[in-house]
Amino acid sequence: MLPINAKIFKAYDIRGIYGEDFDNELAFLLGQAFVALREQDSDYNPQVQLEIAVACDMRLSSPLLKDNLIRGLVTAGAKVIDLGMVATPTFYFAVGKNNYAGGIIVSASHNPKEWNGFKMVRRGGRPVSGETGIEFLKEKILENKFMPKKQVGQVVTLENTLDEEINFALSQVDLKKIKSLKIVADAANSMGATYLTKLFSHLPQCQLTPLNFNLDGTFPAHEADPLKEENLTQLKHSILNNRADLGIATDGDGDRIFFIDNQGETIPPAIIRGLLAKLFLQDKPGAKIGYDVRPGKITIDLIKEAGGIPVVTRVGHSLIKEQMLKENLFFAGESSGHFYLNTEYGCFEYPSIMILKLLVEFSEIQEPIGQYVNRYKKYYSSGEINREVDNKETVFEKIKKSFSDGEINTPDGVSVTYPNYWFNVRGSNTEEKVRLNLEAIDETTMKNKTAEILKIIED
């Protein structure tokens, strides 16, 4: 057995380099530790066998890790529902709709091909984070003192999960409102291809040009991270060459989604989030809508215009989902391309619903999508700028002192608001690094204030 690197236990998941930081034995131990975690939760009933869903992505190491994970769960007495190879949102949907006690998916999301990992959820798709269980799992796994169970579990296979997920998404919109649109989608040889293929098979009026839809864990075309501009080059060229109306890009496990307009320009996630907020507020007037602390004021503007209540959230899917459940937020989105909905099946990413909602919206406008979107580009953004620091807390105190005459909030790092610019400085979860995001009403202010804040951080 390869020694387990304790650094693989992150804030939101378990993730590292396969064959270097961990091997198949970790998956076996994780299966047993996860059962132990659920057995000490308040909703556990010892008279009822735990039903745990398991799935994996298309990485080369994923099937073997999944097999060992199942072996660990069964050894600990659980009934395993094997969902096979599915996207992370499909996995969440299966756990939520079928009311399983929890689930684990083998995936390293958008990380390079050498990586792999595990995302864990409880009932309803509630994420297991560092604060809510990953530390417990880490201790159990590194201790490795599991007692054999008198009765082992069993494995059943469930194959219709994707169909159920897509049918639910299709039920959320009037499909007749979606007109003939030319769309190019790049799945980066990753799991988004599964739901994109199924979804567009129900939309014959749309002409889909698929790029990199064959599942391949070596990522032959490019990395599966649409946040990096170089990974969108092929998609943007194809949009222009095909004179398409819209482009769609998904990440490695399919839980993040980006949209490109007909001019080959990335539509800022803050605008997508604002448009989706407006659309969901038509379904649920006056609802609370979440947006993360990274500046994206157009979202707040659109939420207020549509009669919603904007609510700021921390960054990170686990934290946002917990806040959505606790404060009854209907929809939320992140600058990173995660878009969440709070439904009867759980609170998690529903990319197929987001696509359908936007297709309806873009079908109703009387102008090219790029022209339509440009009206919402009111603010100038610095983008996310990372800096290594000696002490994150010291930086936060310097920021608060230097900008004490601004409106200061601290839900995640330090957020400061002035009439003509606003920014957030927050820390990395895993290293001594801070991230600056700033927005302003004009480009000069954006550049000057970004430089001023970076100087304070670096001094």
Regions found by a protein language model. Give the residues of each.
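N-terminal small/polar loop signature for handling phosphorylated ligands or for N-terminal nucleophile
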Residues: 40, 44-45, 51-116, 199-260
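Gly/Ser/Thr-rich active-site loops/lids in small-molecule metabolic enzymes
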Residues: 127, 210-212, 265-284, 350-360
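Gly/Ser/Thr-enriched, mixed-charge loops and adjacent short helices
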Residues: 116-242
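Proline/glycine-rich low-complexity loops and linkers
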Residues: 135-167, 171, 262-335, 339-340
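Glycine-rich phosphate-binding loop
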Residues: 101-115, 239-261, 266, 310-350
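Phosphate-binding and adjacent anionic-ligand microenvironments
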Residues: 284-459
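An N-terminal, well-structured beta->alpha segment
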Residues: 1-71, 75-76, 155-182
